[in-house]
């Protein structure tokens, strides 16, 4: 008997259930305690500006072009473009884009910024100001409830309308959920201070001497016993963008780009963007995002470690060759329609990272130094990300809120397609929610491949190498013991309307709200969308997901890059 292809399975389900399913089922919506209003509140305000006024056009000189590009950026009025013509621009030192300026090439692969061998410094190209930094925190008082848009300080704060302020509070390891910077190891860098791992970066609309009104309401209720405080961010860069360009770090990558560095660094930014930028070569992080608010990374192509080959070399080992690394704090950002491949982990999120959307990214063909190990594609890797939405991604690997540096909670995976890579048995779990990963929401996902996964769920049992759809509550990647399993992970997990390969069907949680919305952050099909159906992924779609285009060919929904 021939098998029905996986992606066409919903058609059979619909035919079998015809006549037995009531018309007009209730539409599912995320519980208010597990979500925030992402729609209209992520990415550059009013979307990316279309700037047409050219301040200067530069062409490769044949020598070191860094100073000429920096000079053009320094002289560029706000709202105008520094245009780079076709060819390879050689950079002996880093280039940073400043507020109000767009640095635009002639297209990915047409205009190339190539770092020189021996280049010093923590990045090749950046958006940010060397004056970036945090001021001393000001204690907050009064009610600070989720959804509120006003905060009150215990003393005059000195803030101005338009300032960026980081709101946080002390960790609460015994709380519900637990918030802790202690996991397998102890983190000291995932917030303003080691014991302040949960928070929100906000923009101020209005101020008095001791109050401030927020552009986006609070994602979380901050409580007085945990001493909430707010610290202004200085040296913020706003309204800057990089477009239509390739940044090649293949020769210039070095350990100087570790930690807060990267091939491209966005640091202390608001309403900034990368659009149609190719990044070749990640020493540790291809794109490093630090203290970012309402910024967008869209339609970029990010790939290869340093050196690019061999695929199983040490350059793809621990602490090497990440894609986009978001830490230690960032809020209301949008990471959309990017193609990230031949790297260890396409997305890592760590610290007080809240209210962001990672959506419609294509994450195939990960590399790792251990050829049998299944690495993380989208990972929460440090305390304490909350209220982030992971929607519509097409990935090969493992989705993992891990416990390496501590806790995370209240993040949502909606309408994603994930499968395990072929021929690997190390860490063979599609969704690996480890110790301290509480109140996760997984709805409308298409998980696994028929004949690959052997069991539905592993929780509180000794492991024997089983391939599973879910692994819940284990202490670390290498933990295979039932002892010490965190039962709170499964007890607080909301799963609804996910198709998985073990059941070969959609599993509902018993409620009647079985009509899934197309998106949790978009009102409709976005302007950059290609020919793929909308929405593209879900157990209610026929087929359940679009064809895999293969690496280097765009995303499944926008083959030309968006």
Region locations from a protein language model:
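Extracellular beta-strand/beta-solenoid scaffold signature
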Residues: 118-133, 223-233, 255-265, 281-285, ...
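Right-handed parallel beta-helix
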Residues: 100, 238-249, 270-281, 293-307, ...
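Ligand-binding pocket scaffold of soluble enzyme catalytic domains
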Residues: 38, 77, 104, 115-116, ...
